[in-house]
Amino acid sequence: MPASSPVVRDGEYAARGDYHREPDPNWEFYPTYLAKLKAVRSWLDRLPQDTRVLDAGCGEGVLVDEYAGRLAIEGVDANYSSERVRQASLTELPYPDNTFDRALCLDVLEHLTFEQQPKALAELHRVVRRGGEVLVSVPNLAHLQSRVHFLLLGRLIRTAAEAKHPGDRPVAEYLEMAARAGFQLVDRQGIFPTVPVLTRMIRKSPARLMPLHRALTRLLPVPGWCFLNLLHLRKA
């Protein structure tokens, strides 16, 4: 995309602007977002220079801009386009087969419908070379607090309103779907085990209680208990 291309914002970006560039410290998931970025940066930092990377569903392209000087990285998003971000659907990625060595898909799949999710994973599998790897982050519908809520009240706690996360699932279902798409699970990391009461406190005062958030993730990193899961996948 030429450097003179204007920035185009649709959907939530039209209403809120480039809100991921300076996230609100009062956002209830601010500590989880920062912990995720730290883990993703660690993964990207280990890649050799000029590795071809796709950030699928990259939003404003925060990581694309950050790593453009070292990696051959580009982004796609359904609601954003700029110099380094191409506007396109994740279910129809505008790239030939086996284009990329690595790919990111961070907090994206839950925004797709149940019907769209397997198509998006199939597209990621198609555009990544054999042996290539994909790092996926997804919220887990069956996190610890949600399970307790189900036992007491008979329903799980959605990770966001249905209109925002129409594809909300337990992480086990994402893993099954990834396997059907042809991916092998290399590693799995949990962020923010939702211990009841403590979770409510953190979500009410996210910036102030960030040390508590970090302590919980360090002491109880059981992925199935965590609100967010990072799935490190490999194309077989």
Question: Which residues does each predicted region cover?
Answer:
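A short glycine-rich, Lys/Arg-flanked "PGG" loop and its adjoining helix->strand segment in the class I
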Residues: 118-130
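Conserved N-terminal segment of class I S-adenosyl-L-methionine
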Residues: 1-96, 102-106, 118-121, 167, ...
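Acceptor-substrate binding/catalytic loop of class I
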Residues: 157-173
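Short "lid" loop at the C-terminus of a central beta-strand within the Rossmann-like core
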Residues: 140-144, 191-193
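A SAM-dependent methyltransferase catalytic signature shared across enzymes that methylate proteins
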Residues: 172-189
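Conserved beta-strand signature within the Rossmann-like core of class I S-adenosyl-L-methionine
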Residues: 131-138
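A C-terminal cap/extension of S-adenosyl-L-methionine-dependent methyltransferases
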Residues: 135, 151-153, 186-236
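Short catalytic micro-motifs in class I SAM-dependent methyltransferases
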Residues: 107-111
